[in-house]
C-alpha cells in the first residue's frame, strides 16, 4: 500500500538541510500540528455557520446573508467579531469559577478530539492505537461542563437545560459507543488509520456503510443527539427554556458554546466519514493513477496529488453529512424529552447491542467479508 508523504519527516528534513539541529527542528514542528488543527477547525466552523444560514434561507424561501462579502461568506466572521466585543456579564448570584470553567470543559475535549481524525495515510496529528477509545472518552467530558454551566448560572432555565443535556448525552453515548465497537471488531483495531485501510481495495463497495447499515443509522442518530441538533435540541429549546444552559451567558463565554456546538458537528461528520465512508479513499486506485500519469507510485508529485485528493474526499464526505444535518434541523420538528429518552434507552440501546452480537456472529461465519 502506498504510504503517502510523511509531513513530519519531510518538514524536519527541510529544516535540517537549512542548517538547524535535529532537536531544534523537532521543537519547531511540535506546536505546528496543534496550531493547524485549531485553524482548520475554526475555518470549518465558519463554513458550517455560513452553510447553515444559506441553507435555512433556501428552505424558508429567503436570500440569507448577502452583504458581508460575496454571497455573505464573511457573515460568520462578523458574528464572531460581534461576540468578541460584547460585554462579558457574570450574574450576581452565579458561581464565578464554575461559570467560567463550564464552557471551557465543553470546548476543549472537542478540539483535542481532532487529534485522531486522519485526512490521509500520514495526514493526522497522531496515530494512536486507541484513537477511537480516546474520542469516546473525550466526548464523555462535555456533559460535565454543560451541567456545570447550568448549575453555576443559578437560573432555573439554565439548570433544567444542564440536566437535560446530561441526560441526553448519557442516553446516546452508549448506543454511539456500541455502534463504533462493531466497526472496531471488523477492523481489529482502535486506530482510525487501520479502520480506513480496512475499507480500501474495493472502492466504494469496501465502505463499512454496506456492512453496517444498522450501525451507521444508530451512529448518525446518536451523533445528532450528542451535538444537540434538531430534532434533539432539548437542552436549549427556545420555546421552553429560553436558551437552556446558555441563558445567562454572553460575550466570549457564549461564543465558546456556539463554536463548540459547530466544532462537534464537524468532528462527528469527519469521524462518520472515517468509520463508514472510507475516509480519504477515493474510487481511483493509486496504481491506476500512477499508470495514467506514467510515473512511479513513490513519485513525490504523485504523493502530493493523492494527499490533496485524500483531504478533499474526507472534507467533501463530511460536509455532505453536515448538509443533511442542516436540512434535518429546518425540516423536522423537535421531539419531547420523554420521546428522546425512550428512543435512546428503549430502542437504540437494544438495537445497537443486537447489531454488535450480529457483527460478531458474521465475523465468525464470514471472516473474509467481516474482517476475520
From Swiss-Prot:
Main subcellular location: membrane
Source organism (scientific name): Microcystis aeruginosa (strain NIES-843 / IAM M-2473)
Protein name from the UniProt record: NAD(P)H-quinone oxidoreductase subunit 1
EC number: 7.1.1.-
Lineage top rank: taxon: Bacteria
Segments passing through the bilayer: 27-47, 97-117, 130-150, 176-196, 204-224, 254-274, 308-328, 351-371
Pfam families, sorted: NADHdh
Catalytic activity as recorded in UniProt: a plastoquinone + NADH + (n+1) H(+)(in) = a plastoquinol + NAD(+) + n H(+)(out); a plastoquinone + NADPH + (n+1) H(+)(in) = a plastoquinol + NADP(+) + n H(+)(out)
GO molecular function: NADH dehydrogenase activity; oxidoreductase activity, acting on NAD(P)H, quinone or similar compound as acceptor; quinone binding
Thylakoid in keyword set: yes
Family the UniProt entry places it in: Belongs to the complex I subunit 1 family.
GO cellular component: plasma membrane-derived thylakoid membrane
Alphabetized UniProt keyword annotations: Membrane, NAD, NADP, Plastoquinone, Quinone, Thylakoid, Translocase, Transmembrane, Transmembrane helix
Recorded topology in the membrane: Multi-pass membrane protein
Taxonomy of the source species: Bacteria, Bacillati, Cyanobacteriota, Cyanophyceae, Oscillatoriophycideae
UniProt cross-references to InterPro entries, sorted A to Z: NADH_UbQ_OxRdtase_su1/FPO, NADH_UbQ_OxRdtase_su1_CS
Localisation: Cellular thylakoid membrane
Function according to Swiss-Prot or TrEMBL: NDH-1 shuttles electrons from an unknown electron donor, via FMN and iron-sulfur (Fe-S) centers, to quinones in the respiratory and/or the photosynthetic chain. The immediate electron acceptor for the enzyme in this species is believed to be plastoquinone. Couples the redox reaction to proton translocation, and thus conserves the redox energy in a proton gradient.
Subunit and partners: NDH-1 is composed of at least 11 different subunits.
EC primary class: translocase
NCBIfam families: PRK06076.1-2, PRK06076.1-5
GO terms (BP aspect): aerobic respiration; photosynthesis, light reaction
HAMAP family from the UniProt entry: NDH1_NuoH
Amino acid at each position: 500500500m502506498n504510504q503517502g508523504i510523511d509531513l513530519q519527516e519531510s518538514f524536519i528534513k527541510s529544516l535540517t538541510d537549512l542548517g538547524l539541529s535535529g532537536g531544534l527542528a523537532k521543537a519547531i514542528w511540535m506546536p505546528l500540528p496543534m496550531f493547524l488543527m485549531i485553524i482548520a477547525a475554526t475555518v470549518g466552523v465558519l463554513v458550517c455557520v455560513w452553510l447553515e444560514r444559506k441553507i435555512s434561507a433556501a428552505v424558508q424561501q429567503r436570500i440569507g446573508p448577502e452583504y458581508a462579502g460575496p454571497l455573505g461568506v464573511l457573515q460568520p466572521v462578523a458574528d464572531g467579531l460581534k461576540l468578541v466585543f460584547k460585554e462579558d456579564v457574570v450574574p450576581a448570584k452565579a458561581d464565578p469559577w464554575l461559570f467560567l470553567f463550564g464552557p471551557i470543559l465543553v470546548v476543549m475535549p472537542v478540539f483535542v478530539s481532532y487529534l485522531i481524525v486522519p485526512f490521509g495515510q500520514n495526514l493526522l496529528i497522531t496515530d494512536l492505537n486507541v484513537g477511537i477509545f480516546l474520542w469516546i472518552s473525550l466526548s464523555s467530558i462535555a456533559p460535565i461542563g454543560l451541567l456545570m454551566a447550568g448549575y453555576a448560572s443559578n437560573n432555573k432555565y439554565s439548570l433544567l437545560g444542564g440536566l437535560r443535556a446530561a441526560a441526553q448525552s448519557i442516553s446516546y453515548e452508549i448506543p454511539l459507543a456500541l455502534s463504533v465497537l462493531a466497526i472496531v471488531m471488523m477492523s481489529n483495531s482502535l486506530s482510525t488509520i487501520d479502520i480506513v485501510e480496512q475499507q480500501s481495495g474495493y472502492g466504494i463497495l469496501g465502505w463499512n456503510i454496506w456492512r453496517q447499515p444498522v450501525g451507521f443509522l444508530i451512529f448518525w442518530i446518536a451523533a445528532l443527539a450528542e451535538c444537540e441538533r434538531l430534532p434533539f435540541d432539548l437542552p436549549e429549546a427556545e420555546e421552553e427554556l429560553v436558551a437552556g444552559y446558555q441563558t445567562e451567558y454572553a460575550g466570549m463565554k457564549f461564543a465558546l458554546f456556539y463554536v463548540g456546538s459547530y466544532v462537534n458537528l464537524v468532528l462527528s461528520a469527519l469521524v462518520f466519514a472515517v468509520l463508514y465512508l472510507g475516509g480519504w479513499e477515493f474510487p481511483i486506485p493509486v496504481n491506476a493513477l500512477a499508470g495514467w500519469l506514467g510515473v512511479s507510485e513513490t513519485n513525490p508529485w504523485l504523493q502530493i496529488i493523492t494527499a490533496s485528493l485524500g483531504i478533499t474526499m474526507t472534507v467533501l464526505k463530511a460536509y455532505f453529512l453536515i448538509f443533511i444535518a442542516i436540512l434535518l434541523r429546518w425540516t423536522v420538528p423537535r421531539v419531547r424529552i420523554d420521546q428522546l429518552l425512550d428512543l435512546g434507552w428503549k430502542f437504540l440501546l437494544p438495537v445497537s447491542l443486537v447489531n454488535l452480537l450480529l457483527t460478531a456472529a458474521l465475523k465468525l461465519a464470514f471472516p473474509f467479508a467481516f474482517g476475520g
